Amino acid sequence: MLDFDRVLLSFYQLSNCKNDKTDEVETLVKEAMKAVESALDGNRIVGEDIYACEYAAACTAVYDYVCREAFREQNAVTVSGSADINGNFSHRIDAARELKKQAMSRIEGLMPGGGFMFETM
């Protein structure tokens, strides 16, 4: 239902992710698309609704990407073997969470139950 190329393009525009993580990014985007599609009632989608759904999938992928990157950066091990956990990534995660929340709220009318199930995920 959702167009992979449009979701992927939106992901790159939102995340500033470099193209060197293509396989990982494509997997994140596909997983986000699957999650959004499974939460939607396809019979409720009309006209331009699909673009809002694709944007929500991109925002979901951005949130997942930001969480993974924060985890990697916080747990990076230096050459000497000591962990470098000096970075504060909570602001990035909070911003990505808010972006996802706003995008999902735009399409909650297309979900059975008004989006409650997705909010708990």
Predicted regions located by residue number:
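Conserved short "hinge" loops at termini or chain/domain junctions
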Residues: 1-53, 101-121
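Homeobox/homeodomain signature
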Residues: 26, 55-56, 89, 97
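Short amphipathic alpha-helical patches
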Residues: 34-38, 59, 84-85
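Mature extracytoplasmic domains of secretory-pathway proteins
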Residues: 50-59, 63, 67-68
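Short loop/turn elements at secondary-structure junctions
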Residues: 63-121
